[in-house]
């Protein structure tokens, strides 16, 4: 297995940042904000919340796929794989008023899970090279 990030993973990973970047730049560029809100009817906070929720759940599915394909079929990898989904569900249910900062914290919490899957050799060798910058 190579340690070079496959081109499709790199390109699609970077494209996955677009909704985050659009939301970020719309907060510092009034014209972009006006275009998104008026023309496309996009609520920037909703864009961030919905897309971030999707990505955290996607990461759970990714971790589950890595785990189910590994030789190590212990409980810990499966438990770690569902944590992002349980986390996002919990903050949506109980901490709605702090949703955006807690979602941001959820992405930080992915880092130790990524490190675990990489160090345990369940994830591809290039995994952290892709995940940490994203």
Please tell me what each predicted stretch does:
Residues 26-30, 91-95, 120:
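Helix-loop junctions at the membrane-solvent interface of multi-pass transporters
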Residues 1-5:
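Short, Lys/Arg-rich, polar N-terminal cytosolic tail immediately upstream
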Residues 8-30:
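The first (N-terminal) embedded transmembrane alpha-helix
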Residues 29-42:
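Membrane-interface helix termini and inter-helical loops of multi-pass transporters
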Residues 42-45, 76-77, 123-130:
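Non-cytosolic membrane-interface motifs at loop->transmembrane helix junctions
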Residues 9, 116-134:
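Interfacial loop-to-transmembrane junctions
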Residues 17-21, 46-93:
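Core segments of alpha-helical transmembrane spans in multipass integral membrane proteins
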Residues 92-112:
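Transmembrane helix-loop-helix
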